[in-house]
Regions:
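Proteins that catalyze or organize thiol-disulfide redox chemistry
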Residues: 1-22, 26-145
Length: 145
């Protein structure tokens, strides 16, 4: 299951009793595409992603405008930031919750939004073996709750 909305993905995960992998990504993210093409395409990784978790892919550069009532102002890295687009919303979420704004960035969470294991990125988890191990550890942690 792949969702592009944090709340909807979390709701579905609760209903299906599956963990969530947040995938902070971007349309213009070269390493995101490399990860998808070289790592997610592996048969074992693909099976886990498809059947055992809910993926919430949040595009931090999505330009779709938020409705007026959903736009707001916040602080990002100590500076005022107007949140006007879907991408702005996800960028602020990533920065505020996880202290980073690089992509790809993967976070394994439970139904309450608690992080289950360390987060993953392309630099440290950009191989099939490392990413698969990370997924399995996340699943094991979720199943031990």
């Amino acid at each position: 299951y792949v969702f592009h909305d944090y709340e909807k993905g979390l709701e579905h995960a609760k209903k299906e009793n599956l963990p969530v992998m947040i995938d902070f990504t971007g349309w213009a993210c070269v390493n995101c595409r490399k990860m998808e093409e070289q790592v997610w395409s592996d048969n074992e990784v693909k099976e886990i992603l498809k059947n055992e978790i809910v993926i919430v892919s949040l595009y931090v550069d999505e330009r779709t405008k938020l409705s007026e009532e959903n736009q707001y102002e916040t602080t990002l890295a100590g500076k005022p930031k107007k949140v006007r687009t879907v991408g702005d919303k996800w960028m602020v979420l990533q920065a505020n919750l996880y202290g980073t704004n690089s992509q790809p960035y993967y976070v394994f969470i439970d139904h309450s939004g608690n992080q289950l294991i360390e987060s993953a990125n392309y630099q440290d988890y950009g191989t099939v073996d490392k990413f698969k191990d990370w997924l399995i550890r996340g699943l094991n942690e979720f199943n031990n709750i």
